[in-house]
UniProtKB/Swiss-Prot annotation:
Residues 563-657 are annotated as: Type DYW motif. Keywords: Chloroplast, Plastid, Repeat, Transit peptide. GO terms for biological process: chloroplast RNA processing; polycistronic mRNA processing; RNA modification. Disruption phenotype: Abolished chloroplast NADH dehydrogenase-like (NDH) complex-dependent cyclic electron transport (CET) around photosystem I (PSI). The double mutant crr2 kea3 enhances the kea3 single mutant phenotypes, and delays induction of CO(2) fixation after overnight dark adaptation. The lineage of its organism: Eukaryota, Viridiplantae, Streptophyta, Embryophyta, Tracheophyta. PPR repeats lie at residues 45-75, 76-110, 111-141, 142-176, 177-215, 216-246, 247-277, 284-318, 319-349, 350-384, 385-420, 421-451. Its main location: plastid. Disulfide bonds: none annotated. Residues 456-531 are annotated as: Type E motif. One of its GO terms (molecular function) is RNA binding. This is Pentatricopeptide repeat-containing protein CRR2, chloroplastic.
Length: 657
């Protein structure tokens, strides 16, 4: 789709606008220049001054170069270029302004080449307003001048302005080049990622395809990254699949796209393809971070260990983002002690490293330990970020540390100047709600200074599910249905609450509403790794004939556990059925299928690790406790909220999840 009404083109009028101070350069005397016997009047002096300035710039002696500049009336373009580059890398804004003033006084400000360099200089110094002014005063705007401004504005986060200027540039007939498309594609995600920005990105995709840039590896890689940031995995995959040439950056972009958008299997598959197909280049640190993220998502411990070994062999174990990703990977694979050892061996730590460790302890339910690490982080001089508080407040929630969580929430703004965001309020509502302090949770939502979003109302509805508060659940669900009419999970959660309260007419009403809106319940799915291979299991009401062995094993196992005291918990079944039929349904839950497969295919004493995409239900939680006791198995289950470590009939969550 193309713009039906392109922006109106206003032909610029040019006026002399002085945005720099008009004071002549009167620097202190330069002993280097004045004492140089080669400097004398005439052409020889000009050559010597230019050469001296260039030499000083190359040596990083900007102050001295500027002093010599005051003695030179006609610096060459190369001299100005080196001065501008030196200013961008080493100077204060005042030095840059002095060089710019000399260019203006010398009448060289309309040189498009120097204008391009000046815009880049001001961008590097973080002075985007000066960059705009240089652009506005430049009459002959080549594509390089436009690109320089696009780069400056994109880096400064002014994506909307870049896109507006891009359409204007097209209207006046300036041809884009490969750098133009790179900058404007990045501009699409420089601000908030909205549907409007996505549509503009698709239009730019069409433009560059028509103009023959669809085979350029760098542009296509940027396009993959743009679609990834919008969550358009299929578009990104299509672009990547059509690339005739791929480099390590393009492979890394596609792997990151899958890893960040919940496609961990595809991320690992793409990494394997990369290792087979790339001969001239090896995966870099960016690749490793994304692959480790995929391993963490699936709790693929054995594959994560292989990646760790590769990182060590490649010497990437000194790069902070890689080490932080390793800490997270081991934590989310249930090997908290290994993640701690990796962290302890770090020579340098940044806030991301600390956040990784805090989050790892939090997801295992060790709230007190997470708080201890948080305080250790502060003692080491690291400043917390909003992500830090999400991690530590989440840790408090999983262990029920209400007062500690409230204290930390209060310190965010008071001690650290961090304004609580929606995510922090959602953590607090979850903390209070899990502790059955639903009135406090509801009051916090009511007193919020910003509009509560789906995360906050979702936390409240989840708490109502735990404690069976129908009235508050109805209030929260009404807001969620308005905010997220297409999120089937909210309808299912309300139906669960009604089912546990035996309110079957209301269950039917919610199910009809779900069907009327064309929504489907997200099926429960589990993953597990056995001998370095990943297996996936989906909840079904009717058993798959291909899983007859697992089915038969489960039926026998359930009968054995019943003899030992196991009573199936069927309150959450959304059907008004006979007890036997309900038991058959809960026996088909994905975590039970994965558990049975693990019992069949692992040796005695070998732990079973399962990852689930939803909250662990009460029946599966109880069933797994019985299995861990009577089958003498250690079983680790990571659901959407936290880790459950089952051993000898006891769960590490203390039945608080």
């Amino acid at each position: 789709m193309f713009l039906s009404h392109p922006p109106q083109v206003i032909q610029p009028t040019y006026h002399t606008v002085n945005f720099l101070p008009r004071s002549p350069l009167k620097p202190p005397s330069c002993s280097v220049a004045l004492n140089n016997p080669s400097i004398s009047s005439g052409a020889g002096a000009k050559i010597s001054n230019n050469q001296l300035i260039q030499s000083l710039c190359k040596e990083g002696k900007l102050k001295q170069a500027i002093r010599v500049l005051s003695q030179e009336s006609s610096p060459s373009q190369q001299t100005y270029e080196l001065l501008i580059l030196c200013c961008g890398h080493r100077s204060s804004l005042s030095d840059a302004l002095r060089v710019h003033r000399h260019i203006l006084d010398n009448g060289s400000d309309q040189d498009p080449f120097l204008a391009t360099k000046l815009i880049g200089m001001y961008s590097d110094l973080g002075s985007v307003d000066y960059a705009r002014k240089v652009f506005d005063k430049t009459r002959k705007r080549t594509i390089y001048v436009w690109n320089a401004l696009f780069r400056a504005l994109t880096l400064a986060g002014h994506g909307e302005e870049v896109l507006g200027l891009y359409w204007k540039m097209n209207r006046i007939g300036v041809e884009s080049d490969r750098f133009t498309y790179t900058y404007v594609l990045k501009a699409c995600v420089a601000s908030e990622c909205t549907v409007n920005h996505l549509m503009k990105g698709k239009e730019i995709h069409a433009h560059l395809t028509r103009r023959g840039y669809s085979s350029h590896v760098y542009i296509m890689t940027t396009l993959v990254d743009m679609y990834a940031r919008f969550g358009c995995v299929d578009y990104a995959s299509y672009v990547f699949g059509g690339m005739p040439v791929r480099n390590v950056v393009s492979w890394s972009a596609m792997i990151a796209c899958y890893a960040k958008n919940g496609k961990a299997f595809e991320a690992l598959r793409t990494f394997r393809e990369m290792m087979r197909e790339t001969k001239d280049s090896s995966p870099n640190s960016v690749t490793m971070v994304s692959v480790l993220q995929a391993c963490a998502s699936l709790a693929a411990l054995e594959q994560g260990k292989l990646i760790h070994g590769y990182i060590l062999r490649r010497g990437l174990d000194s790069i902070l983002p890689v080490i932080s990703a390793l800490v997270t990977m081991y934590g989310r694979c249930g090997k908290l002690e290994v993640g701690q050892r990796v962290f302890d061996r770090m020579h340098d730590r940044d806030v991301v490293s600390w956040n990784s460790l805090i989050s790892s302890y939090g997801v295992h339910g060790y709230g007190k330990k997470a708080i201890q690490i948080f305080e250790e982080m502060l003692a080491n001089g690291a400043s917390p970020t909003p992500v830090t508080f999400v991690s530590v407040l989440g840790a408090c929630s999983h262990e029920g540390l209400v007062e500690e969580g409230k204290r930390l929430f209060e310190t965010m703004w008071r001690d650290h100047g961090i304004k609580p965001q929606i995510e922090h309020y959602a953590c607090m509502v979850d903390l209070l709600g899990r502790a059955n302090r639903l009135d406090e949770a509801a009051k916090m939502v009511q007193d919020m200074r910003t509009e509560p979003g789906p995360k906050v109302w979702g936390s409240l509805l989840g708490s109502c599910r735990i404690h069976g508060n129908v009235e508050l659940a109805e209030r929260a669900s009404r807001r969620l249905f308005a905010l997220e009419p297409k999120n089937a999970g909210n309808y299912v959660l309300l139906a669960d609450i009604y089912a546990e309260a035996q309110m079957w007419d209301e269950v039917k009403r919610v199910k009809k509403l779900l069907e009327h809106r064309g929504l489907q319940k997200l099926p429960g799915r589990c993953w597990m790794e056995v001998r370095r291979k990943m297996y996936s299991f989906v909840s079904v009401d009717e058993f798959n004939p291909l899983m007859e062995q697992i089915h038969a094993f489960l039926v026998k196992l359930a009968e054995d556990m019943k003899e030992k005291g196991y009573i199936p918990q069927t309150k959450g079944v959304l059907y008004e059925l006979e007890t036997e039929e309900k038991e058959r349904i809960v026996l088909g839950h994905s975590e039970k299928l994965a558990l049975a497969f693990g019992l069949i295919n692992t040796s005695k004493g070998e732990p079973i690790r399962i990852t689930k995409n939803l909250r662990l239900c009460e029946d599966c939680h109880l069933f797994t406790k019985f299995i861990s006791k009577f089958m003498e198995k250690e079983i680790l289950v990571r659901d959407v909220n936290r880790f459950h470590r089952f051993k000898n009939g006891v769960c590490s969550c203390g039945d608080y999840w």
